[in-house]
From Swiss-Prot:
This is Adenylate kinase. It comes from the Bacteria. ATP binds at G10, A11, G12, K13, G14, T15, R123, V132, Y133, K200. One of its GO terms (cellular component) is cytoplasm. The gene is adk. The modification N6-acetyllysine is found at K192. The keyword Chloroplast does not apply. Its EC number is 2.7.4.3. It comes from Escherichia coli O8 (strain IAI1).
Amino acid sequence: MRIILLGAPGAGKGTQAQFIMEKYGIPQISTGDMLRAAVKSGSELGKQAKDIMDAGKLVTDELVIALVKERIAQEDCHNGFLLDGFPRTIPQADAMKEAGINVDYVLEFDVPDELIVDRIVGRRVHAPSGRVYHVKFNPPKVEGKDDVTGEELTTRKDDQEETVRKRLVEYHQMTAPLIGYYSKEAEAGNTKYAKVDGTKPVAEVRADLEKILG
């Protein structure tokens, strides 16, 4: 099962990604993690990425696609994968298609901007595992502590209101057009597209996802 998650930052993708990974036994592929791992491994692609990043430039779509292809060929992607944060633009989606990376489901998490601002400003994370909590909507069992390890939770610098609003503007300009792109792909029978009401409580969104993914 190959899945792409779409939705603005704070639409609930991270929380549901954890659920999808555990339920369906597929890894989450984040381009940031993938780039860091490639640089660390010292592979040919990793060296190219390091040179570009060291020069303060953005890694090209071609290089990211090559890394995605390399990553999804690994054993743990045998049953599929979950792509989060990629593709971000229509040229990236086109490049994926040209590279023969097919996707079974595109899930759009739909949440109004104001609710997103509320959600992000109250967000707390367990940095080592990536587990995400919220003081109001998804609190940990013990305030300020991770449920699994009991370690301290922190607030990301990115979770300040001004930063959040800037990211939402960027999302609407750059990534939102992918919604139309993948709707058309679904009409052509190339993928399945589903809109998920991300305003619902976590458990209800989870139940909706189970219905969609089976």
